[in-house]
């Protein structure tokens, strides 16, 4: 080797740096084209995580909605229990009311010696009706109203010139409702058009 061909140590270092830069430049396009398998795995895991988070949000919303529904149903059941707690008792009181009304209907009002007793039965019936009314019990069975199969039970149909067709013309037994729920239908005679 000649002195011209021999390089100084500084030149050798510079040549090595340039060669390294060239190799890096050649290697860089290769790494850019080849995807790192770790990046693919990270993207896959992020997608799974996002899907699981969405499922958990949906489940949480469903559970919350179900809890609200259970709470609402429980409140409605409690309200119904309070509202209709006296239903059995009220049903047992209806024959007592009927008997007091029958006693008044059959009493001899012309007999002066029975006047005090009749007045006492009337006051007792009035007190009883006031008491049951406070608990939501209402009487069904007025004469002259249109026949309603939801609250009336037709016992007979009679021709009548005094009443419109399909109207209650006589009440045989009063009916009762408890807070809008039918306890007992009114037994009635219904008018029909004369032939």
Curated annotation (Swiss-Prot):
Q: What Gene Ontology molecular function terms does this protein carry?
A: adenyl-nucleotide exchange factor activity; protein homodimerization activity; protein-folding chaperone binding; unfolded protein binding
CC annotations in GO: cytosol
Instruction: Return the PROSITE patterns for the record.
Output: GRPE (PS01071)
Compartments it resides in? Cytoplasm
Bias class Basic and acidic residues marks the residues at 1-20
Q: Where is this region: Disordered?
A: 1-40
Q: What is its main location?
A: cytoplasm
Q: Which UniProt keywords apply?
A: Chaperone, Cytoplasm, Stress response
Tell me a GO biological process for this protein: protein folding
Q: Does the keyword Cytoplasm apply?
A: yes
Q: Could you name the domain of life of the organism this protein comes from?
A: Bacteria
- Tell me the subunit arrangement: Homodimer.
Family, per entry: Belongs to the GrpE family.
Q: What's its job?
A: Participates actively in the response to hyperosmotic and heat shock by preventing the aggregation of stress-denatured proteins, in association with DnaK and GrpE. It is the nucleotide exchange factor for DnaK and may function as a thermosensor. Unfolded proteins bind initially to DnaJ; upon interaction with the DnaJ-bound protein, DnaK hydrolyzes its bound ATP, resulting in the formation of a stable complex. GrpE releases ADP from DnaK; ATP binding to DnaK triggers the release of the substrate protein, thus completing the reaction cycle.
What PANTHER family does the record point to? GRPE PROTEIN, GRPE PROTEIN HOMOLOG, MITOCHONDRIAL
Q: What name has this protein been given in UniProt?
A: Protein GrpE
Q: Which gene encodes it?
A: grpE
């Amino acid at each position: 080797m000649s002195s011209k061909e021999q390089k100084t140590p500084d030149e050798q270092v510079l040549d090595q740096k340039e060669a390294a830069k060239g190799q890096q430049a050649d290697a860089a396009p290769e790494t850019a084209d080849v995807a790192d398998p770790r990046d693919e795995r990270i993207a896959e895991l992020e997608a799974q995580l996002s899907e699981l988070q969405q499922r958990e949000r949906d489940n949480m919303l469903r559970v919350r909605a179900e809890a609200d529904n259970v709470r609402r149903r429980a409140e409605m059941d409690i309200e119904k229990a309070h509202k209709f707690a006296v239903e059995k008792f009220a049903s047992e009181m209806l024959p007592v009311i009927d008997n007091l009304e029958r006693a008044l209907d059959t009493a001899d009002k012309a007999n002066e010696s029975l006047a005090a007793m009749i007045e006492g039965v009337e006051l007792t019936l009035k007190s009883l009706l006031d008491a049951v009314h406070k608990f939501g019990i209402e009487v069904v069975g007025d004469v002259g109203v249109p026949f309603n199969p939801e609250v009336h039970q037709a016992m007979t149909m009679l021709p009548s010139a005094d009443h419109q067709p399909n109207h209650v013309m006589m009440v045989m037994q009063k009916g009762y409702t408890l807070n809008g729920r039918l306890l007992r239908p009114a037994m009635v005679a219904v008018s029909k058009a004369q032939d």
